[in-house]
């Protein structure tokens, strides 16, 4: 990801919150295999684990955390991961595997949009030296992936049980807002028949990514002058759409942050 200084976000807690607010990541792996493509990507919702002890919180900028997810075994990417584990098990007795090469997980923000040059109310009439662009936000995580796919292993069962419960809880409460009280109560995994859940668990694999680097980008017209940014905000607000209002809000927030530096 191209990171101009004006667009880059390096504050780890903010990037972690971005992931929690936008947990659907795109996992990309590069696994050499005679049976599957080298490069594969899948959309996977992730749970982010970050240190929660006082000592670790003080070092949160140095501790990006861990991402947990699961993939259907029928997914070709999962099959490549299982193939790699099988080759590893031929040499060891381990029921899990951390791949030696990095993987990449990309998280996109909730709003992105084309930006017309007509929004730039200072530069366009003054010089005409403006071109279209696209505003968006994203966070990418690099790290080492561990695969849990031996359905007979107790370690795999425990990982998957925790994963599906934590993911459902986060999605129901933080994303849907089903917190009880005046709001609806959340759906829980225990609401479904236990044998049904156990059957589904046999058809998924678990993945855990130990994050080694987090990078964030908010490309929201910060590179433009104040007058042009004001035009961008007005232009998106006049669209009268949810996406337009979201972009306008972020352009203002990011512009204010730039001006304060």
From Swiss-Prot:
Matching SUPFAM superfamilies: FMN-binding split barrel
> One Pfam match, by short name?
FMN_bind_2
**Which InterPro entries would you find in this protein's record?**
Split_barrel_FMN-bd, TR_PAI2-type
Q: Which family does it belong to?
A: Belongs to the PaiB family.
Listed PANTHER family: PROTEASE SYNTHASE AND SPORULATION PROTEIN PAI 2
Protein name, entry field: Uncharacterized protein AFUA_5G13800
**Species classification:** Eukaryota, Fungi, Dikarya, Ascomycota, Pezizomycotina
């Amino acid at each position: 990801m191209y990171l101009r200084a004006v667009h880059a976000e390096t504050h780890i807690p903010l990037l972690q919150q971005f992931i929690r607010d936008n947990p659907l990541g795109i996992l990309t792996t590069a696994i050499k295999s005679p049976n599957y493509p080298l490069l594969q990507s899948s959309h996977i919702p992730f749970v982010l684990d970050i240190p929660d002890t006082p000592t670790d919180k003080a070092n949160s900028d140095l501790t990006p955390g861990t991402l947990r997810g699961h993939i259907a075994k029928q997914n070709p990417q999962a099959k490549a991961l299982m193939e790699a584990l099988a080759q590893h098990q031929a040499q060891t007795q381990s029921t899990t595997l951390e791949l030696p090469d990095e993987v990449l997980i990309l998280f996109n923000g909730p709003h992105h949009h084309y930006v017309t040059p007509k929004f730039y109310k200072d530069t366009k009439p003054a010089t005409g030296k403006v071109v279209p662009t696209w505003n968006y936000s994203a966070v990418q995580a690099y790290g080492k992936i561990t695969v849990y796919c031996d359905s007979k292993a107790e370690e795999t069962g425990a990982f998957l049980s925790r994963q599906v419960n934590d993911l459902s809880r986060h999605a129901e409460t933080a994303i849907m807002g089903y917190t009880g009280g005046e709001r609806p109560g959340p759906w829980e995994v225990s609401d479904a028949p236990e044998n049904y859940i156990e059957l589904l668990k046999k058809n998924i694999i678990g993945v855990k990514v130990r994050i080694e680097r987090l990078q964030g980008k908010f490309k929201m017209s910060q590179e433009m002058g104040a007058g042009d940014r004001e035009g961008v905000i007005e232009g998106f607000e006049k669209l009268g759409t949810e996406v337009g209002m979201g972009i306008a809000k972020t352009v203002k927030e990011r512009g204010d942050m730039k001006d304060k530096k």
